[in-house]
Every structure is written in structure tokens, then in C-alpha cells.
Amino acid sequence: MFAKYLKKPWIWTTEPTCRNFTRKHSVKGKRTPDIGQDLIKVFEHNGIPVRLTEKEECCGMPKLEQGDLETVDKYRQTNIPELVRLIDEGWDIVAAIPSCVLMFKQELPLMYPDDPDVQKVKQHMFDPFEYLVHRHKAGLLNTEFSQELGKVVWQVPCHQRVQNIGPKTRDVLALVPGTEVEMIERCSGHDGTYGVRAGTYDKSQKIARPVISRAKKMDA
């Protein structure tokens, strides 16, 4: 698991962007820990501090999509106080999964508009590449890339697109010399648990076919 990979919290500073960073643990720590580990390496390379939350639950997006509002609220009661505590210590929040970012940026604030703590978390939640763009604008991103990436096919996550932050992943990848980013702006069919449940798996595969087909044609 990703939490075991880190072994203990890391605390760094990101000045002069006046932002600190907390990486929100998520499903990627259990199923694809390498993604979280790679993100840590990228941030390390750029001198960005990283710390895992010590107490947390799922962001609640899968339960929200199933209409289980009681569990969503249960997760909120665990997550929000912990994140607010870290924010008050000077940290910002980043999650590797767009759905998690969207949950804290948009869904929970809409569900709890009068909760000041939910609104505070909203203001300090960032997509990882959005955060890197902030660093770049402040002149703090390490752009001394040693290897070209060639052609990169990027399927724009639906839950990232609706955050209205722009194609920040493309913007960062495009900084690497000799890199061509091809964007696919179609749904992957995954949608949280939709792509893994027995009752919806076949439908999710059908939705994903155009994305897979385009990726193959692009010959990345």
C-alpha cells in the first residue's frame, strides 16, 4: 500500500509560492501504488514537501454515485476535520485521482454550503498538475528535462475536465522538449466503481472502446 511505501510523513516547504502540500491517500495506494510513488518522486524533484494524512476515509465519490448519502456524510466527518487541521498548519491538499479532487472541490461544497470547514478544504484542494503549474508560474518548476517523451496520448479524465481548471496535465507535459501531447476528450467508462461492477462492466467497456481505438490509432 502507498502508506506503507512512505513509512512515515514527510514535511517540506514550498515557499515562495506560499503553498504547502499534503497528498491525500486514495484508492491508488491500494490498486496502483506506483502512480502515487511516481507523483512523490516528481514533487521531490521539484522540492515540494509531501505528507500523507494520518487519518482518513475514501473521499466518498463512489458512495455518492450510488446514492449512499449517509456514508458520504460519515466520510466527511472523518476527512474534513483532519484536512482542516493540516490546512491550518500551512498545508495544501492534493489527490492523485481527479474524482477525489472533484469531490472536495465541488460535490461536498455543494452538499454542505454552510459548512465553513468544507469550504476551507475546497480552497486548498488541487489537482497535481494544477499544483505544478502554480510552481511553474512562480518560476519554481524544474524544467531541466533530460529525456524527450515523444508522442503522449492523454485521455482527459471527465472528473478533471469538469473542474474547469484547463488541461493542466497537457500544459506540464508540453514543457518537456520533444514531446507531442494528443488529447482524447471522451469518457473512459470507468466512473468510480461503474467500470468494475458486474452489472455495469460490459457497458463500461462499450463506452471505453472509442478511447481505446483512438489511442491505438495515434500509435503512442
Where are these regions (language model features)?
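Iron-sulfur cluster-binding electron-transfer modules in prokaryotic oxidoreductases
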Residues: 1-220
